[in-house]
């Protein structure tokens, strides 16, 4: 394995870590509606536990309301029940075969709670990135120990991985601040 491969590998893993963090942030409810918030809702479909997106069409009506259109009319009650029983704190209402899911306004206390959750998730992502940095540096040290690279090459590799880590952590911080601003906006 070369230094370039170590750096490329670390970069790919760090990008995956940031992508996972973005997905985690999407699941955190803010005052605004977005279809992704219902991704974690599963519905009993003839004995199978399926994600909501596989049994219904989920769209936005406006900034605070999600529309769920079941593909089978008989599923409307099961979908409504699954949304209500999820830990999202949502109260869907059924209008025939269309289910409307209004997003309740967040209380100040809940907003502060959610910002703590966002910060904690951000810290967890940073720890994951730092662990990837450590792994990459350990690989470079092993190459040095096996005399496959010089000390200068090892030092250069450590510096490049550190710059990459700093850039990724800055991206995570930017995402955290953006989500906090979104949560705290009334």
From Swiss-Prot:
InterPro entries: Ribosome_recyc_fac, Ribosome_recyc_fac_dom, RRF_sf. Responsible for the release of ribosomes from messenger RNA at the termination of protein biosynthesis. May increase the efficiency of translation by recycling ribosomes from one round of translation to another. This is Ribosome-recycling factor. NCBIfam families: frr (TIGR00496). One of its GO terms (biological process) is cytoplasmic translational termination. It holds the Pfam family RRF. One of its GO terms (molecular function) is ribosomal large subunit binding. It is found in: Cytoplasm. It comes from Leptothrix cholodnii (strain ATCC 51168 / LMG 8142 / SP-6). It comes from the Bacteria. Gene3D superfamilies: 3.30.1360.40, Ribosome-recycling factor.
